From Swiss-Prot:
Keyword DNA damage recorded: yes
Pathway: Protein modification; protein ubiquitination
Domain UBC core: 4-150
Database matches in InterPro entries: Ub_conjugating_enzyme, UBQ-conjugat_E2_core, UBQ-conjugating_AS, UBQ-conjugating_enzyme/RWD
Family: Belongs to the ubiquitin-conjugating enzyme family.
Active site: 88 (glycyl thioester intermediate)
Originating organism: Candida glabrata (strain ATCC 2001 / BCRC 20586 / JCM 3761 / NBRC 0622 / NRRL Y-65 / CBS 138)
Enzyme class: transferase
Region annotation (Disordered) ranges: 148-167
Swiss-Prot/TrEMBL keywords: ATP-binding, Chromatin regulator, Cytoplasm, DNA damage, DNA repair, Nucleotide-binding, Nucleus, Sporulation, Transcription, Transcription regulation, Transferase, Ubl conjugation pathway
Signal sequence coordinates: none
Protein name (database record): Ubiquitin-conjugating enzyme E2 2
Length: 167
């Protein structure tokens, strides 16, 4: 059934395929356009550089009038990310407007890697280290970057096994 939300999500998907912003990718699940997998690559010249961070975006029928529920699936050590992966970002709450699309959501999240907001911490430990002990903060972030590589390699191994099951 085609609804305004589903039509908009198909437009968002077309845009992501044709003109994806650097360092982000996203696509709906094959059987559900309302649920998307996404990935953000850590930007250069940040402690997150070259990390591969997976996210889940869940939309409801009120999209684009309401923001999606977005969370990191990859472990993330960041002042604005809760332990459960949920993200403290104004455009996902009180500053949402229907002009935002999947690409702009992901680039806004990616910009948090460059510019964390320790004044509005979701992770108090990360915010404190970011403000007061930058070298310890960077060390912890680099650990999550390495873990992101391991997790993605594990996922690739799992998908290889799935492919073998199909044969």
């Amino acid at each position: 059934m085609s609804t305004p939300a589903r039509r908009r999500l198909m437009r968002d998907f077309k845009r992501m395929k044709e003109d994806s912003p650097p360092g982000v990718s996203a696509s709906p699940l094959p059987d559900n356009v309302m649920v998307w997998n996404a990935m953000i690559i850590g930007p250069a010249d940040t402690p997150y550089e070259d990390g591969t961070f997976r996210l889940l975006l869940e939309f409801d029928e009120d999209y684009p009038n309401k923001p999606p529920h977005v969370k990191f699936l990859s472990e993330m050590f960041h002042p604005n990310v809760y332990a459960n992966g949920e993200i403290c970002l104004d455009i996902l709450q009180n500053r949402w407007t229907p002009t935002y699309d999947v690409a702009s959501i992901l680039t806004s999240i990616q910009s948090l890697f460059n510019d964390p907001n320790p004044a509005s911490p979701a992770n108090v430990e990360a915010a404190t280290l970011f403000k007061d002990h930058k070298s310890q903060y960077i060390k912890r972030v680099k650990e999550t970057v390495e873990k992101s590589w391991e997790d993605n390699m594990d996922d690739m191994d799992d998908s290889d096994e799935d492919d073998e099951d199909d044969e």
